[in-house]
């Protein structure tokens, strides 16, 4: 191949991720790359929660259009922003090693969630984070918070919030780890499906490119992500419901932990299951939780 064009969003984190992939392709596959940046609807519409304006696909559509029109060969995403069902003709071609998957508690005044006073204002637009936070501390006030990492941090620094919740991985990648006041234990806030994993999206028809990209694939990330996404797909979960899933690999055994909650955090169901087939494991755990009333909880 002469050159690979990578479609990317314009935020600092998106460009960090895209440059990470670009450097790996150039050094390990010896193929030159260029980056083509673009704004997505998810970047433009910031005054409404994602679940009200179309969900995670809003961060991807423009990049996928660029690939379909031959303006880009691949796109790079945070896996947690990728819906469980891709548009026809697209696939996830490479999973990168996972960064810390935990949620991060960020505050200028308080050291942890436990330190927050009653009625403290916490910023997050994630229903998953909101539900788990309210389940743990029902005396907090959760307010929506959209925008890139820098925008969210500046709103915290301006005093709009007592604390905000972000993904640890993004802060670590942007060398902002010192802003993390507490890595929230997964027992309190189970991560989003795929959180901490960067993925490459490509067209299924591009066999030559897929074969090359596969050489960059991290087997462990691929296996745990497949389990988490299979669980999410079986539940048909998007950003309009409070769902979390996190898998760990030990030898060939996958331990999958999952959570569904009502949006107010009053009802929560957590389960875990161990297996060696990621797709089967994700589906079985989802079916077990459906039998225990997962849909009723998500609807409430």
Curated annotation (Swiss-Prot):
S-(dipyrrolylmethanemethyl)cysteine sites (modified residues): 239
Q: Which Gene3D superfamilies match?
A: Periplasmic binding protein-like II, Porphobilinogen deaminase, C-terminal domain
**InterPro entries attached here?**
HemC, Porphobilin_deaminase_cofac_BS, Porphobilin_deaminase_N, Porphobilinogen_deaminase_C, Porphobilinogen_deaminase_C_sf
One GO biological process term: protoporphyrinogen IX biosynthetic process
> Is-annotated flag, keyword Cell membrane?
no
Residue spans crossing the bilayer:
none
User: What UniProt keywords apply to this chain's record, in alphabetical order?
Assistant: Porphyrin biosynthesis, Transferase
Enzyme Commission number(s) from the entry? 2.5.1.61
Pathway listed for it is:
Porphyrin-containing compound metabolism; protoporphyrin-IX biosynthesis; coproporphyrinogen-III from 5-aminolevulinate: step 2/4
Provide GO CC annotations from the record.
cytoplasm
What reaction(s) does this enzyme catalyze?
Answer: 4 porphobilinogen + H2O = hydroxymethylbilane + 4 NH4(+)
How cofactor binds (record note)? Binds 1 dipyrromethane group covalently.
GO MF annotations for this entry?
Answer: hydroxymethylbilane synthase activity
Q: Is ATP-binding among this UniProt entry's keywords?
A: no
Cofactor(s) listed in the protein's UniProt record? dipyrromethane
Query: What does the miscellaneous comment read?
Result: The porphobilinogen subunits are added to the dipyrromethane group.
Name the HAMAP family for this protein. Porphobil_deam (MF_00260)
Q: What does this protein do?
A: Tetrapolymerization of the monopyrrole PBG into the hydroxymethylbilane pre-uroporphyrinogen in several discrete steps.
**Would you identify the family this protein belongs to, as annotated?**
Belongs to the HMBS family.
- Record's protein name: Porphobilinogen deaminase
- Organism expressing this protein natively: Francisella tularensis subsp. tularensis (strain WY96-3418)
Q: What is the lineage of its organism?
A: Bacteria, Pseudomonadati, Pseudomonadota, Gammaproteobacteria, Thiotrichales
């Amino acid at each position: 191949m002469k050159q690979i064009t990578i479609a990317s969003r314009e935020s600092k984190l998106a460009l960090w991720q895209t440059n990470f992939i670009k450097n790996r392709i150039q050094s390990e596959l010896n193929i030159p790359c260029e980056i083509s940046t673009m704004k997505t609807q998810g970047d433009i519409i910031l005054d409404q929660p994602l679940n009200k304006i179309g969900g995670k696909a809003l961060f991807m559509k423009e990049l996928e259009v660029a690939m379909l029109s031959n303006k880009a060969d691949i796109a790079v995403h945070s896996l947690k922003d990728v819906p469980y069902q891709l548009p026809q003709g697209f696939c996830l071609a490479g999973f990168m090693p996972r960064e810390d998957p935990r949620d991060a508690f960020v505050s200028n005044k308080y050291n942890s969630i436990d330190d927050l006073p009653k009625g403290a204002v916490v910023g997050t637009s994630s229903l998953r984070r909101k539900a788990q936070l309210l389940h743990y501390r029902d005396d907090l006030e959760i307010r929506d918070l959209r925008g890139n990492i820098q925008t969210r941090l500046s709103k915290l620094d301006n005093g709009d919030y007592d604390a905000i919740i972000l993904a640890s991985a993004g802060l670590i990648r942007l060398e902002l780890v010192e802003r993390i006041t507490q890595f929230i234990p997964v027992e309190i806030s189970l991560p989003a499906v795929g959180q901490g994993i960067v993925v490459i999206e490509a067209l299924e028809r591009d066999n030559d490119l897929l074969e090359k990209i596969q050489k960059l694939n991290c087997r462990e990330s691929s296996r745990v992500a497949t389990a988490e996404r299979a669980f999410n797909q079986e539940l048909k979960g998007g950003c309009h419901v409070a769902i979390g899933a996190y898998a760990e690999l030990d030898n060939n055994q996958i331990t999958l932990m999952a959570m569904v909650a009502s949006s107010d955090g009053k009802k929560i169901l957590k389960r875990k299951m161990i297996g060696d087939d990621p797709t089967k494991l994700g589906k079985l755990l989802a079916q077990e939780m459906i039998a225990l009333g997962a849909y009723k909880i998500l609807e409430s």
